[in-house]
Design a protein with these regions (language model features):
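Bacterial signal peptide processing site
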Residues: 24-27
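C-terminal motif of bacterial Sec signal peptides marking the signal peptidase cleavage site
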Residues: 19-22
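Short, structured beta-strand/loop micro-motifs enriched in basic residues and often containing a Trp
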Residues: 150-159
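Short basic/hydrophobic patches in alpha-helices and adjacent helix-turn junctions
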Residues: 175, 211-212
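N-terminal export and membrane-targeting signals
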Residues: 1-15
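Short acidic/glycine-rich loop or secondary-structure boundary segments that cap or lie
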Residues: 111-112, 146-149, 182-184
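Flexible, gly/ser-rich surface segments that form the specificity/activation loops bordering the active-site cleft
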Residues: 158-202
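Catalytic histidine site
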Residues: 30-34, 39-144, 189-206, 213-273
């Protein structure tokens, strides 16, 4: 089944779920809170007493007021093609940890070898580009690559693909886009091809980090934005993409989860110094 058809199928599944629950998302024109995405305030910058402890399995959403106040993520522009995308998770080269950059959706590299700017500052052209539904590319030389998302949520780690595939229907997932800003939605389907989220995005959000929020105020990365269809978004799993491009995600030293103590987490990470 094609990716667009799968996104359409995800929309149908979501619609059926709403019908079966006999619930409405609005009453008298006013929005009603979805129990699966209750607006629990998350304190940005909070840290656990023991950063290596296993994180919670209950994930939260980011309240709209807090999301709206967050600065938009860095925009990447390929100058020759004009292609605009979002800087994905901050990474370090597996072979050279001091080399920093961003992982991005593969289709952002429209003219290979062309110059790329990050927030107006020129960095290296995209490299190691792989195309397709789960395409990926990287750009290096980004001095502003930091282990945070959504304006200050510290990155704790990356969930393995099989763990993300077991996330339940309705699990809150958030995105940090250069165009749409910080948005949160819910899981509609997970399979071997990727993660489907009820989350409207805009052109230019491709590559944006998809992440889960813990009540410690930290972010756990699960994927990057690849495609959209209506109010639904398809994301590629982050962990296997990192292996394909020889990169590791930067984590914050005060928030990092040790994959040796929590096997749900990938070891494709490095603590930012």
């Amino acid at each position: 089944m094609s990716r667009r058809k799968r996104l359409g199928a995800a929309a149908a599944v979501a619609a059926a779920a709403v019908a079966l629950s006999a619930c409405s998302t609005a009453t008298g024109g006013a929005p009603v809170t979805d129990p699966a995405t209750s607006n629990v305030t998350v304190a940005v910058g909070a840290q656990a007493a023991d950063p290596s402890a296993e994180v919670e399995s209950t994930w939260l959403t980011i309240p709209a007021t807090q999301a709206d106040a967050a600065p938009k993520r860095i925009e990447l522009t390929q100058t020759a093609s004009g292609a605009r995308c979002t800087a994905g998770p901050a990474i370090a080269a597996a072979s050279t940890p001091t080399r920093r950059g961003f992982v991005v959706a593969g289709h952002c590299d429209e003219l290979p070898g062309s110059a790329v700017s990050a927030g107006g500052e020129f960095i290296e052209p995209y490299t190691d580009t792989q195309r397709g539904d789960r395409g990926v590319t990287v750009t290096w030389g980004a001095a502003n690559a930091a282990p945070t998302v959504a304006g200050g949520f510290k990155v704790a780690g990356v969930l393995k693909q099989d763990v993300v595939q077991r996330l339940e229907y309705g699990t809150p997932v958030c995105m940090d886009g250069a165009i749409s800003g910080v948005q949160c939605g819910t899981v509609t389907e997970n399979d071997a091809s990727g993660i489907y989220v009820k989350l409207p995005i805009e052109r230019g959000d491709s590559g944006a980090p998809l992440f889960l929020v813990s009540d410690r105020g930290t972010a756990t990365l699960i994927g990057i934005v690849e495609q959209r269809s209506g109010n639904f978004t398809f994301g590629a799993y982050l962990d296997p993409l990192l292996a394909e491009v020889g990169a590791k995600v930067l984590t914050d030293r005060t928030a990092a989860i040790d994959p040796r103590t929590d096997p749900r987490y990938s070891d494709a990470v490095t603590v930012a110094q």
